[in-house]
Amino acid sequence: MTDHALLLANLGSPASTEVADVRRYLNQFLMDPYVIDLPWPLRRLLVSLILIKRPAASAHAYASIWWDEGSPLVVLSRRLQEAMKTHWSHGPVELAMRYGEPSIEATLQRLADQGVRQVTLAPLYPQFADSTTTTVIEEAKRVVRQRSLDLRFSVLPPFYDQPEYLDALVASAKPYLEQGFDHLLLSFHGLPERHLHKLDPSGHCLKGDDCCRTASPAVLATCYRAQCLRSAELFAERMGLRPEQWSVSFQSRLGRAKWIEPYTETRLDELAAQGVKKLLVMCPAFVADCIETLEEIGDRGREQFVEAGGESLQLVPCLNDHPDWVAALKVLCERAPQAL
């Protein structure tokens, strides 16, 4: 075995559907300053208020989609890890979660103890956001610094416009699109608008309806919304979809702050009102199915759409461990630049 490891990193999951485990997970997640970017006292107060009721509600939601093997996100990520072991010939392939287990800290320590000296860190987020990509990288930096680990890193950058990722999306989604549909909704995870403004010193973001399409390369590099729209446009182009056949929305809004629009819950009602009966929904910001896809879209979203007058909502599975995605990820990781 060589000393160059691949570390796949995703968001994470509670250890179980018990309320105590869900509360512990939500506390770790929401107290991350890259997720709720408020000063510590305000963040602590807000999270404490959220944790009064949300753990029980979230535990119920997790229980509705939990598998016998465990959390769908963790199970599917493990399957991807196992598949990558047959493609990554440079050393061990490990999986870590930013929140929950297996932790980034324990995984990096284990790799260092095994004699690994080079790590390709792969945050499994196609589009860039501080609350996803940055927090994974910063956690790895913290661990290396505090534990004095002798590790060098290359980091997989956002791959929202990379042909390998887009081709894998096409390969995984094509069988569902070929079954016939009235409309395709590309539902990305949402973000508070302030997250975009914070990373845009130029003041370009959200200044007009067309701001994402006219973004400079510098703005595009850190604008999550622009990267989502670019992914959607490139996917639709590859699939030969006409503009009226598809649209984009943003899901998973939390709290009362203004988040990027349009909201998925609003679009579901609008599409039903427009006469759409057979709706396909893809979630291209997620590479593995999780509570946001299986429960928020596959269960609650379907129920909302049907109640609004639609007939069926088909959730297209995420990339998960699709063979084309495994092959694509190998290529993307092997050309990851040196960083950290």
From Swiss-Prot:
> According to its UniProt record, where is this protein located?
Cytoplasm
Uppermost EC category: lyase
Task: Tell me if Iron is a UniProt keyword of this record.
Answer: yes
Q: In which pathway does it act?
A: Porphyrin-containing compound metabolism; protoheme biosynthesis; protoheme from protoporphyrin-IX: step 1/1
Q: Which residues bind Fe cation?
A: 189, 292
Q: Please tell me the species this chain comes from.
A: Ectopseudomonas mendocina (strain ymp) (Pseudomonas mendocina)
Write the protein's name: Ferrochelatase
Q: Which reaction does it catalyse?
A: heme b + 2 H(+) = protoporphyrin IX + Fe(2+)
An example GO biological process term is: heme biosynthetic process
Q: Name one GO molecular function term.
A: metal ion binding
What's the name of its gene? Answer: hemH
Query: What stretch or stretches form a coiled coil here?
Result: none
* InterPro entries (alphabetical): Ferrochelatase, Ferrochelatase_C, Ferrochelatase_N
